[in-house]
């Protein structure tokens, strides 16, 4: 089985027709489903949050079979993920896609579990400490995209689980947990 870094690629990745949008509806639906799963699994395993449709992305080509996804195929597969609420287009031209391998609510739950696991109830942290502090090392929060983290924190703020406060810069933004 072919690997990309430490990620095992599925069998279909070596099947040339899967790099071309299939004309038969049932086959295309299966193709889209396989690509959605592959993109989400790969992004989660590699902690990738942004995909540029026009940029080099390891899954968009397979040199072993000399195949690459067309722009249309890339946009189709990413749009299918967007349609499931697992990604969002960051621009009207569909050039950049924010990948949500966890939905925002799930990220919010991960933050709450992180707070409980580390005894941080009624504590204050900066947003950067949540992303890259000692407590986050080895957790799913380590290196989380700032946009995703802020949306999860705002969701928790709306539920009364924390208070966000501004510092003098983005690095100083604070979080007061009240779990």
From Swiss-Prot:
Q: Which Gene3D superfamilies match?
A: Winged helix' DNA-binding domain. Chain C. Domain 1, Winged helix-like DNA-binding domain superfamily/Winged helix DNA-binding domain
| Alphabetical UniProt keywords | Endosome, Protein transport, Transport
Q: Which Pfam families match?
A: ESCRT-II (PF05871)
Q: Does the keyword Manganese apply?
A: no
Q: Where in the cell is it found?
A: Endosome
Superkingdom, taxonomy of origin = Eukaryota
InterPro entries listed in its UniProt record: ESCRT-II_cplx_Vps25-sub, ESCRT-II_cplx_Vps25-sub_N, WH-like_DNA-bd_sf, WH_DNA-bd_sf
One biological process GO term for this chain?
multivesicular body sorting pathway
Q: Does the keyword Ribosomal protein apply?
A: no
Q: Which GO terms describe its cellular component?
A: ESCRT II complex
Function statement? Component of the ESCRT-II complex (endosomal sorting complex required for transport II), which is required for multivesicular body (MVB) formation and sorting of endosomal cargo proteins into MVBs. The ESCRT-II complex is probably involved in the recruitment of the ESCRT-III complex.
Q: Which family does it belong to?
A: Belongs to the VPS25 family.
Q: Which PANTHER family match?
A: VACUOLAR PROTEIN SORTING-ASSOCIATED PROTEIN VPS25, VACUOLAR PROTEIN-SORTING-ASSOCIATED PROTEIN 25
Q: How does it assemble?
A: Component of the ESCRT-II complex (endosomal sorting complex required for transport II), composed of VPS22, VPS25 and VPS36.
Name-wise, this protein is: Vacuolar protein sorting-associated protein 25
Which gene is transcribed and translated to give this protein?
A: VPS25
